[in-house]
Amino acid sequence: MDNLEVIKLLNLDFKGELEATMLYTYNAFIIDDCEISRLIEGAAADEMRHMWWLADLITKRGGRPSMEHGKIEYMEEDVKEALRVQIQKETEGIRKYEKHVKLIDDEEVVGVLRHIIDEEKRHRKEFKEKLEKLK
């Protein structure tokens, strides 16, 4: 896979991290439950860090990170629904990253993507645990 193709995939990943950062930050602002809000705030910070890692990989390969994002469905104050949506976003992100790991033959990129996968799995687990406590 050439650099342009790698950059294209990394920009798709970057877009997902940007959207997650925006959604999680918003949810952390509006959710009254302090424990859940802080958990989501921490995940938002992780997602932003992932953006930095991806931007570094993109620029090292001659590309520019795209700040374009899709439509973000912001939740109102339904904590359970917010957690369900976040679990879904993490699951989708994990699948996308796992697919990209199989497609990309750049050792540095694959190493970073695997690390991000591990963090996304942790987020998903933590969100699931909080959701179970609310049931």
Question: How would you describe each model-predicted region?
Answer:
Residues 1-135:
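Non-heme di-metal
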